[in-house]
Amino acid sequence: MATPLFESTIKSLPLLGRGKVRDIYAVDADKLLIVTSDRLSAFDVILPNPIPDKGRVLTAMANFWFAKLGHIVPNQLTGIDPESVVAADEREQVKGRALVVKRLKPLPIEAVVRGYVIGSGWKDYQDTGAICGIALPAGLKQAAKLPAPIFTPASKAEVGDHDENISFAQAQANCDAVLAEALAGTGKTGAGLAEEARQAAIALYSQAADYAAGRGIIIADTKFEFGIDAAGTLHLIDEALTPDSSRFWPADSYREGISPPSYDKQYVRDYLETLDWNKKAPGPDLPADVVERTAAKYREAYEKLTGLTLA
């Protein structure tokens, strides 16, 4: 197990920003270096304890899915070795946990696909009989499989804020407003790209869910992000189908009517719910056993899904 990395310090490249988990550096005008740290956020708060190997698991899993699903939509990968774009004494920070990616203009939405009634979708369904305004059959139980996957976009939040579910019409309006300048002269519209993103997200989820089912894992829901190049071509960016962006359930313990155990940070969320904490920064320290159990869950998810062992 490698030494945990809470925050990268790449001095040889300009730092553009830090997200909840990823640190982003400029390689040149066309490319970025994205370093996936071992930071963990819960309830949109970054917690003080890194989770060993988490960044390496997320990077390896994203690479696995980018390769498997690359025929559906282009992605951000350049194929350039991250160790080749940093100084020699910085290579250990990027080894196994970084990607050199194309610089793309992000769509201003989170592309969420749900295959099961769980989480905020379950709460919404109980209140309204719908999820994000999409009407569903009556009488569904918690964790029930939906008749078909649904696309439920969310607005993108700044670090520390919460993403908010929005209607598809609002997603189209947001894309029109934010992408108008970038799309000038391409013949494309933001609303049209939102529709492309919806179709791509459902196709990505459906093929991934079929594959995962054969490995004994249910992908209950997931979140994608998309960006465009100068021609307005849609690309899959950020991460893909990782324990941070998805809800993975072991198929052998799944049943309707309960919230199934999952291969993700739910173990941390459950622990935090036992504390007297207001879910605002700063987050509380995690006990060693919670850190270790969470690290094991991430590795197990990768190994079960891919059949590979983390190097």
UniProtKB/Swiss-Prot annotation:
- Pfam families according to UniProt: SAICAR_synt
Q: Which InterPro entries match?
A: SAICAR_synt/ADE2_N (IPR028923), SAICAR_synth (IPR001636), SAICAR_synthetase_CS (IPR018236)
Q: Name one GO molecular function term.
A: ATP binding
Q: Which Gene3D superfamilies match?
A: ATP-grasp fold, B domain, Phosphorylase Kinase, domain 1
In Gene Ontology terms, what is a biological process of this protein?
'de novo' IMP biosynthetic process
Q: Which domain of life is it from?
A: Bacteria
- Matching PROSITE patterns: SAICAR_SYNTHETASE_1, SAICAR_SYNTHETASE_2
Matching SUPFAM superfamilies, A to Z?
SAICAR synthase-like
Give the record's keywords alphabetically: ATP-binding, Ligase, Nucleotide-binding, Purine biosynthesis
Q: In which pathway does it act?
A: Purine metabolism; IMP biosynthesis via de novo pathway; 5-amino-1-(5-phospho-D-ribosyl)imidazole-4-carboxamide from 5-amino-1-(5-phospho-D-ribosyl)imidazole-4-carboxylate: step 1/2
Give EC number(s), comma-separated.
Answer: 6.3.2.6
Reaction equations catalysed: 5-amino-1-(5-phospho-D-ribosyl)imidazole-4-carboxylate + L-aspartate + ATP = (2S)-2-[5-amino-1-(5-phospho-beta-D-ribosyl)imidazole-4-carboxamido]succinate + ADP + phosphate + 2 H(+)
The EC class name is ligase
The answer to whether UniProt assigns keyword Secreted to this entry is no
Give the record's GO CC terms: cytoplasm
The family annotation for this protein states: Belongs to the SAICAR synthetase family.
The record's HAMAP family line, in alphabetical order, gives: SAICAR_synth
Q: Which NCBIfam families match?
A: PRK13961.1, purC
Q: What is this protein called?
A: Phosphoribosylaminoimidazole-succinocarboxamide synthase
